[in-house]
Structure formats: C-alpha cells, structure tokens
C-alpha cells in the first residue's frame, strides 16, 4: 500500500516540477527573443543582425516544440499517477 501511494504522490510532484521547468524555459526563451530583437534593432545593422535574429527565432521555434513535448509528458505522467492513485484507493480502502 505505502509503495503505490508513495509512487503516485512522487509522480505528481515530478510532473509539477517538470511543468514548472517548462514554464521557466518558455519564459526565458521569450525574454531572450525580446532582448535579441531589441539589440538587433538598435545596435546592429545589416546582415549580421538579420542572421543573429533569424538564429534566435529558429531556436525559439525549436524550443517551443520541446516545451510542448514536455507538457505532453507532464500530462502523461499525471495520467499514470491518477491510475496508480485509483488502484491504491480501490485496493487499500
């Protein structure tokens, strides 16, 4: 009983931490894109600025895909934790 109850509780905590990580990663990427656009808009000129901005924007798109994958993983972990919780509640009540 204790093992199953501990496992699903740990899964919930892990999923919560992973979700917080995804949120922080998304925030930092948006901040990076914003700061890059500000710098390239005012300080840099020409092809170098365009190339750097394009690189950051491509990286942002890739990171958004990774963040979405993390969120899907969080959903799957939460679903498994709920399954374990239901099993624990049925077996040990």
Task: Label the predicted regions.
Residues 1-93:
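N-terminal secretion-targeting helices of virulence/extracellular proteins
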């Amino acid at each position: 009983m204790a093992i199953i109850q501990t496992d699903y509780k740990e899964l919930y905590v892990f999923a919560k931490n992973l979700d917080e990580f995804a949120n922080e990663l998304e925030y930092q990427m948006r901040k990076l894109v914003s700061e890059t656009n500000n710098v390239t808009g005012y300080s840099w000129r020409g092809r170098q600025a365009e190339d750097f901005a394009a690189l950051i924007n491509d990286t942002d798109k890739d990171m958004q895909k990774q963040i979405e994958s993390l969120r899907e993983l969080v959903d799957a972990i939460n679903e498994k934790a709920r399954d374990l919780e239901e099993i624990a509640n049925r077996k040990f009540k």
